[in-house]
UniProtKB/Swiss-Prot annotation:
This is Phosphate-import permease protein PhnE. It is found in: Cell membrane. The keyword Transmembrane helix applies. Belongs to the binding-protein-dependent transport system permease family. GO terms for biological process: phosphate ion transport. The chain crosses the membrane at residues 23-45, 85-107, 134-156, 187-209, 216-235, 245-267, 287-304, 345-367, 395-417, 452-471, 478-495, 505-527. Part of the ABC transporter complex PhnCDE involved in phosphate import. Responsible for the translocation of the substrate across the membrane. Induction: By phosphate-limited conditions, via derepression by PhnF, and probably also via the two-component regulatory system senX3/regX3. It is a multi-pass membrane protein. Coiled coil: none annotated. CDD domains: TM_PBP2 (cd06261). InterPro entries: MetI-like (IPR000515), MetI-like_sf (IPR035906), PhnE/PtxC (IPR005769).
């Protein structure tokens, strides 16, 4: 009796902790669900390994027909390459300009009203959920063939990413500087400019540079729908079955994207990791890079022959196209629409599963602190870079030519493309782990494999799961546009409805795509919040 009276009470947090599933338990549940979803999805699209084995001869034959690569008109290809680069820079810059005020309205700690925050968040979510190629198709239909639809498509889709990241950065700022500035009696805008902006500029710059890198890859494929860039020449070569010319253009694209990635690394180092020994040099470099950005945007308007007024006048003809999509017509396609939508999700699931299986080994070998030998590290890094340089839509064209029309070609394209995305994230996550556990395992005689399974994977597992879920989100979004080249999914129905001017049917398909992408994004985000 006395023992019970003197026993200290249990902490109040204990019951809630006991009800919360452990991290290993959640990982097991997610793994089981992923395996079941992969099996069901593979069955739904008739994806079997024997299909790849049977089609391997066709793939090899197609690659042999591409060799040796050639450039029939180097001057024209060079101009299209410059056009592609300028489209990416201008589109990203316009998106950043639009995202800054939108982010302040969407951030919880800077929005003037909850209703304004909800509207701003809805705009950002819509731009992120709609694929850029879909925006490009609609703008080409509204404004005609040219680079302006491509620039606008890149800008609108980029708002979805930049706006969200910018708003998240604002919400994570320290409130202390704002209170100090507010105490001096300055207004609302001066408060934001003096107290919030200095805290978020580094993360904004990093994301802006990263988005240019992404948009350069995206601008390559916009030419497939007549939205300018080097993709138009690539599509022309593939349509004419001139495969050596197509491979030559792909090599040019590889050089451009690889160069841009190296330049982005250098820019981030200059802007975000200033040298303590020579601050004057860093200041000059920053002003110089700012001048290069402004000069590139001016050059984009001149060389791309874009009237600056078109940035404001595009709204009216585009609204005319969008209004023709309302009310949406779900009856025209009937059950075929939802069958194609289910196929889109299945393609994303299977491609993600294969991509994870291929990306984790490549990412581990590409991690400098874990790779067993430089002879494995550098080829792994090069392989990741090469795969990242080739957009999934181009891979889909190759697999359609080798394996035929259908979801299998789209699944293979997304699976290979996933390596460039996920393997890099895996390598970055592994390089950031604590070296202490690795040294402890090695100190007791543990070899490379023992170190990998006992020290590396346990530390990096949450990041691997989070990146894999994000890859699934990206793959489902990308699979919605692969239908443009006959690689399965709902994209084929969408582009056919737009081509035949059935905009009410296109409106129904757009709504279905939005619901799918938004639901997947929310689901993966919820799982990441539980695991990471």
């Amino acid at each position: 009796m006395t023992t019970e009276i003197t026993r200290p009470p249990a902490p109040p947090s204990r019951p809630s902790e006991s009800r919360k599933p452990s991290l290993p338990g959640l990982l097991h549940l997610v793994a089981i669900a992923a395996v079941l979803a992969t099996i069901v999805s593979a069955w739904a699209i008739d994806f079997v390994p024997t299909a790849l084995i049977d089609g391997s001869d066709n793939i090899v034959a197609l690659l042999q027909r591409m060799i040796p690569p050639r450039l029939d008109d180097p001057a024209r290809i060079g101009m299209l390459a410059v056009e592609t680069l300028l489209m990416a820079v201008l589109g990203t810059t316009l998106a950043a300009i639009a995202s800054v005020p939108l982010a302040f309205l969407a951030a919880r700690n800077t929005t003037p009203h909850p209703a304004v925050q909800a509207v701003a968040r809805a705009v950002i979510t819509f731009c992120r959920a709609m694929p850029d190629l879909l925006f490009a198709v609609l703008f080409v239909r509204a404004l005609g063939i040219g680079v302006l639809p491509g620039v606008l498509a890149l800008a609108l889709h980029s708002i979805g990413m930049l706006g969200k990241v910018f708003a998240d950065a604002i919400e994570q700022t320290d409130a202390g500087p704002r209170e100090a500035v507010r105490s001096t009696g300055v207004g609302y805008f001066r408060e934001l400019l003096n107290a919030v902006v200095p805290q978020v500029v580094p993360s904004w710059i990093a994301m802006f540079v990263y988005r240019i890198d992404i948009n350069l890859r995206m601008s390559v494929v916009l030419g497939f729908v007549g939205a300018g860039g080097i993709g138009f020449a690539l599509q022309d070569a593939l349509r004419g079955l001139i495969y050596p010319r197509a491979l030559g253009i792909v090599c040019v694209i590889l050089v451009i994207i690889a160069g841009m990635e190296l330049l982005a690394i250098a820019i981030r180092r200059i802007l975000l990791d200033p040298s303590r020994s020579n601050p004057l040099r860093d200041r000059i470099a920053r002003f110089g890079l700012s001048g290069v950005l402004v000069g590139s945007c001016v050059a984009a308007f001149v060389l791309l022959k874009i009237n600056p007024l078109a940035l404001f006048t595009w709204v009216f003809p585009s609204v005319g196209i969008f209004t023709r999509m309302v009310p949406p017509n779900f009856d025209a396609l009937g059950v075929d629409l939802f069958t194609a939508a289910a196929q889109t999700v299945a393609i994303g699931v299977v491609a993600t599963a294969i991509g994870i299986a291929l990306s984790i080994p490549a990412g581990i070998l590409a991690a400098r602190n874990v790779s067993p030998h430089p002879a494995l590290y550098w080829p792994a890094r090069a392989w990741i870079l090469v795969v990242r340089a080739v957009p999934e839509l181009i891979l889909a064209v190759v697999f359609v030519a080798a394996l035929g029309l259908g979801p299998i070609a789209g699944t293979c394209a997304l699976a290979i493309g996933s390596i460039g995305f996920l393997a890099k994230l895996v390598a970055d996550a592994v390089e950031e782990i604590d070296p202490g556990p690795m040294e402890a395992v090695r100190s007791v005689g543990g070899g490379w494999w023992k170190t990998l399974f006992a020290a590396v994977l346990p530390q990096s597992m949450p990041a691997l799961v989070g990146s894999s879920l994000y890859l699934f989100d990206v793959n489902v979004r990308t699979s919605t546009i692969l239908g443009i080249v006959g690689a399965g999914g709902v994209g084929y129905l969408l582009f056919e409805s737009i081509r035949t001017l059935n905009f009410d049917v296109a409106g129904a398909i757009v709504i279905v795509i939005f619901v799918i992408v938004y639901a997947i994004e929310r689901l993966s985000g919820w799982i990441r919040s539980r695991l990471v």
